[in-house]
UniProtKB/Swiss-Prot annotation:
Belongs to the complex I subunit 4L family. GO terms for molecular function: NADH:ubiquinone reductase (non-electrogenic) activity; quinone binding. This is NADH-quinone oxidoreductase subunit K. It catalyses: a quinone + NADH + 5 H(+)(in) = a quinol + NAD(+) + 4 H(+)(out).
Length: 104
């Protein structure tokens, strides 16, 4: 059975992170920005699992930390979507340019 080299995982994670970063910085829809942030977190999880597999001391610590970050990302997504729903109810929009001020 052939093993995939570490560099493949790192390049994949880099591509996913760059796509997420580009979307988070350029898009004006807050839902899309939230999805891009989640994509960046998934790229970090790929790195965690890859380094856990190919590191000097392979073990389960990388997978456990990846599961922890997935849990945190799920909570972040739930809170983010709840905030977006409240903003949409008040402002009738989800575009960043129109909801950037805190006053009502």
């Amino acid at each position: 059975m052939s093993s995939v080299p570490l560099s493949v995982y790192l390049v994949l994670a880099l591509i996913l992170f760059c796509i997420g970063l580009y979307g988070a910085l350029t898009k004006r829809n807050t839902v899309i920005v939230l999805i891009c942030i989640e994509l960046m977190l998934n790229a970090v999880n790929i790195n965690l699992v890859a380094f856990a597999k190919y590191g000097a001391h392979p073990g389960i610590a990388g997978q456990i930390f990846a599961l922890f970050t997935i849990t945190v990302a799920a909570a972040e997504a739930a809170v983010g979507l709840a905030i977006l729903m409240a903003l949409y109810r008040n402002r009738k929009t989800v575009h960043i340019d129109e909801i950037d001020s805190m006053k009502h």
